[in-house]
Swiss-Prot record:
GO terms for cellular component: brush border; cell junction; cell projection; cortical actin cytoskeleton; focal adhesion; plasma membrane; Z disc. GO terms for biological process: actin cytoskeleton organization; bone morphogenesis; focal adhesion assembly; muscle cell development; negative regulation of calcineurin-NFAT signaling cascade; negative regulation of cold-induced thermogenesis; negative regulation of glycolytic process; negative regulation of oxidative phosphorylation. InterPro entries: Actinin_actin-bd_CS (IPR001589), CH_dom (IPR001715), CH_dom_sf (IPR036872), EF-hand-dom_pair (IPR011992), EF-hand_Ca_insen (IPR014837), EF_hand_dom (IPR002048), Spectrin/alpha-actinin (IPR018159), Spectrin_repeat (IPR002017). F-actin cross-linking protein which is thought to anchor actin to a variety of intracellular structures. This is a bundling protein. Spectrin repeats lie at residues 288-398, 408-513, 523-634, 644-747. The keyword Transmembrane does not apply. SUPFAM superfamilies: Calponin-homology domain, CH-domain, EF-hand, Spectrin repeat. Ca(2+) 1 binds at residues 773, 777, 779, 784. This is Alpha-actinin-3. Homodimer; antiparallel. Also forms heterodimers with ACTN2. Interacts with MYOZ1.
Length: 901
């Protein structure tokens, strides 16, 4: 006959002796009877000895004992006797026969009795016990030990094993060289057992004389003292424990549980102290969180207050280098100074939400930050900071472009002004000469023609002067910092130009008057002058154009310059022919002079330009053409590099931007419509958070490309709609969103565990909340909240609904969050500590007196929390109290906001 028994409501393990779910959780996890463990002879030996000693400690009360655990229980008689002793109940009369079926019947009666106590023994049958199966016999005894010796051990709502471990940790915490973390290796040196005995019976052991390097001596001391003075039989061998790498956990638990029961009478005061410590710890932790919030909020607001004026300062710098230093300072701010503050702001919101949740769960009044430090105040200040930051960056880039333009215009102005001043040098003196008065007719006509050529040259320079004036005007409009010197130079050029015009007109009038007196003019020299002057102007213009500086921002603009230069080069053959024709005129003059024996004039009376001048300028043009070719190709290469940078940045930004947007929407959907258990939701969110963190390298690479663009002074990108600022803002929004959503789920876990909610209840609450969350923003407006309550069966009048709103919306924000909704739905059924419970706990510590002394507090509570109570408790004002008596009733009421501390 095979019996499958298990304690009802015990454990969730999956071993052959594992239990189900419920209050007796001592069977879960490593409490499962692992069959493979018995393959270790050392563990089998320890369990056999320990379990035998444990059984004998109870059987001796009935005047019997066992010697061989797998043999002495085979007939079921001593097994039934053991159950009667430890339970205090009578079992059915055993069968007296010695046949196998009699033994099986007796064992089954014992197993039936175990089953009647809510214990399920999976895979253990009476036949295996009767057959002397050591593994099954040890498993059955271990289950009996769990049910009758360990199951009822509970410390602060923990499972049996966890409660026993926590009890051991608390009792041994003050002792040196003792660190109880488990029921195997933590007990090998014997100090933990000695500490347990010394904690409750300091008169039995001199703990100060114990040495950690003498484990066998320590263990034997504990065993002997326990057996002699505490009536706890020796269940273990010191040598087995020391020489085994990992002593058997169940043997240790069985032996340690005997100490727990031996010292159970001293636990009432400790339980009361634990309750007070728990309440005080909650209060102290909340106060610490409040102080941290105030400190973080003050520091963040102070940083914003200092930073905003700097970002709002729009005073420009006169030089490009100074503005670039400002831009570098701004980059350092975005890269080094702001990210930690973003993290602080996010952490501040998380701390605030966590604090409010803890206050609600512990029935403390809601935390109201000091004036100006609300989360909304910080959010408003942060928005102001970001607005100032965006305006500051736009202003910086605009100023840099303006200074670039100014620098280019100033260089162009100086170049053209220098060329013009070089051209006009001596022209006023030349126009003021009166040489025509003593000249011959031919010389006068030559002077006239020369003057005509000058006027042609002067007219050709009119555009240059107008261009110089236009450049000066543009520099003034762009607020050039050296505008005064530019204006002064431009005014001097314009005044000189007007004077040149006046002098030119006066000289023409004089020469035309003299022309009537003169008849001969050398036509060839005139022809030379007429053709050489415009060609010379063309040469000057060509030199000026070839030396001209440019400012381009794209490949297309550079290609346009290259095309214009190619077109100019195409005109060079025609210009060379014109040069040959002009030089041919001079050759003709020399030929005529040679033919007729004339003495050629050393100068052309119509023009000062010589053929050598034309050849020199022509050579200059020929040399400048390849130089400009090289410069244009270098600029084209630079612009092509910039274009590749633009495309590289755009390719990443066009991938990152939609990814961030998709993640933001995905997080929003997760927050609004979460399914599964809170742990599953948290795991999903943590996975999302890790995915987002892992994606940070893409943002860093994009920042690097953006840095290269800025260093190359590239400020536009037609290949993408995403700027670095868009990516940064989206990234910060994504980090904040995932952190806030994780915090909401953590708070729901706190609420669920504190209120005892099931996952089905949470899912039902979430479904109702989502249905009435019209805007899908995680909050219900008052009308939607009222409709939700009505749909759930609440009959609400105006006064009652107003009362409920003050509970779920204490700050009068006009919305109801999901956390507040859950708090309301579970408020009346929650099992929490109260002021009355704390008063009752203090009364136990005070020995039933209405007051308590500082000495009693220091004796029963940890030092830190005892001093905390002494500082905050008011003196007891009742009659018959000694000096220094403290009022613990008023103090307990103040902890829950029912009075002032």
């Amino acid at each position: 006959m095979m019996m499958v028994l298990q304690p009802e409501g015990l454990g969730t393990g999956e071993g052959p002796f594992a239990g189900g779910r419920g209050g007796g959780e001592y069977m879960e996890q490593e409490e499962d009877w692992d069959r493979d463990l018995l393959l270790d002879p050392a563990w089998e030996k320890q369990q056999r000895k320990t379990f035998t000693a444990w059984c004998n400690s109870h059987l001796r009360k009935a005047g019997t004992q066992i010697e061989n655990i797998e043999e002495d229980f085979r007939n079921g008689l001593k097994l039934m006797l053991l159950l009667e002793v430890i339970s205090g109940e009578r079992l059915p009369r055993p069968d007296k026969g010695k046949m196998r079926f009699h033994k099986i019947a007796n064992v089954n009666k014992a197993l039936d009795f175990i089953a009647s106590k809510g214990v399920k023994l999976v895979s253990i049958g009476a036949e295996e016990i009767v057959d002397g199966n050591l593994k099954m016999t040890l498993g059955m005894i271990w289950t009996i030990i769990l049910r009758f010796a360990i199951q009822d051990i509970s410390v602060e709502e923990t499972s049996a094993k966890e409660g026993l471990l926590l009890w051991c940790q608390r009792k041994t915490a003050p002792y040196r060289n003792v660190n109880v973390q488990n029921f195997h290796t933590s007990w090998k040196d014997g100090l933990a057992l000695c500490a347990l005995i010394h904690r409750h019976r300091p008169d039995l052991i001199d703990y100060a004389k114990l040495r950690k390097d003498d484990p066998i001596g320590n263990l034997n001391t504990a065993f002997e003292v326990a057996e002699k003075y505490l009536d706890i039989p020796k269940m273990l061998d010191a040598e087995d424990i020391v020489n085994t790498p990992k002593p058997d956990e169940k043997a240790i638990m069985t032996y340690v549980s005997c100490f727990y029961h031996a010292f159970a009478g001293a636990e009432q005061a400790e339980t009361a102290a634990n309750r007070i410590c728990k309440v005080l710890a909650v209060n102290q932790e909340n106060e610490k969180l409040m102080e941290e919030y105030e400190k973080l909020a003050s520091e963040l607001l102070e940083w914003i207050r200092r930073t905003v004026p700097w970002l709002e300062n729009r005073v420009g710098e006169p030089s490009m280098s100074a503005m670039q230093r400002k831009l570098e300072d701004f980059r350092d701010y975005r890269r080094l100074h702001k990210p930690p503050r973003v993290q602080e702001k996010c952490q501040l919101e998380i701390n605030f939400n966590t604090l409010q949740t803890k206050l609600r769960l512990s029935h403390r009044p809601a935390f109201m930050p000091s004036e100006g430090k609300l989360v909304s105040d910080i959010a408003n200040a942060w928005r102001g900071l970001e607005q100032a930051e965006k305006g500051y960056e736009d202003w910086l880039l605009s100023e840099i472009r303006r200074l670039q333009r100014l620098q280019h215009l100033a260089e162009k102005f100086q170049q053209k002004a220098s060329l013009h001043e070089a051209w006009t040098r001596g022209k006023e003196d030349m126009l003021s000469q009166r040489d025509y008065e003593t000249a011959s007719l031919q010389e006068v006509r030559a002077l006239l023609r020369r003057h005509e050529a000058f006027e042609s040259d002067l007219a050709a320079h009119q555009d240059r002067v107008e261009h110089i004036a236009a450049l000066a005007q543009e520099l003034n409009e762009l607020d050039y910092h050296e505008a005064a010197s530019v204006n002064s130079r431009c005014q001097a050029i314009c005044d000189q130009w007007d004077n040149l015009g006046t002098l030119t007109q006066k000289r023409r009038d004089a020469l035309e008057r003299m022309e009537k007196l003169l008849e001969t003019i050398d036509q060839l020299q005139l022809e030379f002058a007429r053709r050489a002057a415009p060609f010379n102007n063309w040469l000057d213009g060509a030199v000026e154009d070839l030396q001209d500086v440019w400012l381009v921002h794209s490949v297309e603009e550079t290609q346009s310059l290259v095309t214009a230069h190619d077109q100019f080069k195409a005109t060079l053959p025609e210009a060379d022919r014109e040069r040959g024709a002009i030089l041919g005129i001079q050759g003709e003059i020399q030929k005529i002079c040679q033919t007729y024996g004339l003495r050629p004039s050393s100068t052309n009376p119509y023009i000062t330009l010589t053929p050598q001048d034309i050849n020199t300028k022509w050579d200059t043009v020929r040399k400048l053409v390849p130089s400009r070719d090289q410069m244009l190709q270098e600029e084209l290469t630079r612009q092509q590099v910039n274009e590749r940078l633009r495309r590289q940045f755009a390719a990443q930004a066009n991938a990152i931007g939609p990814w961030i947007q998709g993640k933001v929407e995905e997080v929003g959907r997760l927050a609004a419509g979460m399914a599964g258990s809170l742990e599953e939701q948290m795991a999903g969110l943590r996975q999302q958070e890790q995915n987002i963190i892992n994606y940070k390298s893409n943002i860093d690479r994009l920042e690097g490309d953006h840095q290269l663009l800025q260093e190359s002074l590239v400020f536009d990108n037609k290949h993408t709609v995403y700027s670095m600022e868009h990516i940064r803002v989206g990234w910060e929004q994504l980090l904040t969103s995932i952190a806030r959503t994780i915090n909401e789920v953590e708070n729901q876990v706190l609420t669920r565990d504190a209120k005892g909610l099931s996952q089905e209840q949470l899912n039902e609450f979430r479904a109702s909340f989502n249905h009435f969350d019209r805007k899908r923003n995680g909050m219900m407006e008052p009308d939607d909240f009222r409709a939700c309550l009505i749909s759930m069966g609440y009959d609400l009048g105006e006064v009652e609904f107003a009362r409920i709103m003050t509970m779920v919306d204490p700050n009068a924000a006009g919305v109801v969050t999901f956390q507040a909704f859950i708090d309301f739905m579970t408020r009346e059924t929650a099992e929490t500590d109260t002021a009355e419970q704390v008063v009752a706990s203090f009364k136990i510590l005070a020995g039933d007196k209405n007051y308590i002394t500082a000495e009693e507090l220091r004796r029963e509570l940890p030092a830190e929390q005892a001093e905390y109570c002494i500082r905050r408790m008011a003196p007891y004002k009742g009659a018959g109290a000694p000096a220094g008596a403290l009022d613990y009733v008023a103090f307990s009421s103040a902890l829950y906001g029912e009075s002032d501390l």
